Amino acid sequence: MVRKVLMICLGNICRSPIAEVVMVDTLEKANVKDVEVDSAAIGGWHVGNRADPRAISTLQKHGLKCTHIVRQIRKQDFSEFDYIFGMDEDNMSELRRLAPKGSKAELLMLGDFGLEKKNRIIEDPYYERGAEGFETAYQQCVVACAAFMKERLQK
């Protein structure tokens, strides 16, 4: 049975593409099969573009490649995916608002896995934090993706 994971952030150019690539890498290194991972945006501003160059650069620094093209979340994602992750409380509120009644997808905050409560929000590095913020988001994703995999996907 294939399980499907969708990473969500506001614009799908910073946090969610990093989380997508990190989750794929985490699963490959653990030899976990039958899991598909994608990412998408809450908003449609960047649809059709690539991830932020700082996100791509951060991933490259860790030997990872990002070829993702931005897309916006769709209603059918809530029935096609098993797990949909937000990066912060605003993402989670929007996901709950957008989710059709009776949706199959479990809505989760990525930082609730493996991170201390005070560090569970994966902050948007787009405006405030330069390259350092992207590295912080990457490191949070590494911890959270590994913890989620161990808790939910390696059973």
Curated annotation (Swiss-Prot):
Gene Ontology molecular function: acid phosphatase activity; non-membrane spanning protein tyrosine phosphatase activity; protein tyrosine phosphatase activity
Tissue-wise expression: Cone cells and primary pigment cells in developing pupal retina.
One Gene Ontology term, aspect cellular component: cytoplasm
Reactions accelerated catalytically: O-phospho-L-tyrosyl-[protein] + H2O = L-tyrosyl-[protein] + phosphate; a phosphate monoester + H2O = an alcohol + phosphate
Gene3D superfamilies, A to Z: 3.40.50.2300
EC number of this enzyme: 3.1.3.48, 3.1.3.2
Location of this chain's protein in the cell: Cytoplasm
Main localisation: cytoplasm
Cysteines paired by S-S bonds: none
CDD domains: LMWPTP (cd16343)
UniProt cross-references to InterPro entries, sorted A to Z: LMW_PTPase, Ptyr_pPase, Ptyr_pPase_sf, Tyr_Pase_low_mol_wt_mml, Tyr_phospatase_low_mol_wt
Catalytic residues, chain numbering: 9, 15, 124
Signal sequence interval, chain numbering: none
Swiss-Prot/TrEMBL keywords: Cytoplasm, Hydrolase, Protein phosphatase
Function: Acts on tyrosine phosphorylated proteins, low-MW aryl phosphates and natural and synthetic acyl phosphates.
Family from the record: Belongs to the low molecular weight phosphotyrosine protein phosphatase family.
Name of this chain's protein: Low molecular weight phosphotyrosine protein phosphatase 1
